[in-house]
Design a protein with these regions (language model features):
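Short, conserved catalytic or interaction motifs in soluble domains
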Residues: 37
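A short, Lys/Arg-rich alpha-helix, primarily the initiator
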Residues: 1-13
């Protein structure tokens, strides 16, 4: 769940909606929601894409 909380916190700090972040890394809004809720986790490639958005 910690990873999901971190994704949500960083996303909000960048002023991104779930939809906008999803578009930027080519996943669905539901995928972002699932990550933030800790239901699923990003794969290594997706983690790299996320890290680039949060630089």
């Amino acid at each position: 769940m910690q990873l999901g909380n971190n994704i949500q916190t960083l996303r909000k700090k960048k002023g991104l909606s779930q939809e906008k972040l999803a578009e930027k890394i080519n996943v669905t809004r539901q995928t972002i929601s699932n990550w933030e809720l800790g239901e699923t986790a990003p794969n290594p490639e997706q983690l790299i894409l996320l890290s680039k958005q949060f630089e």
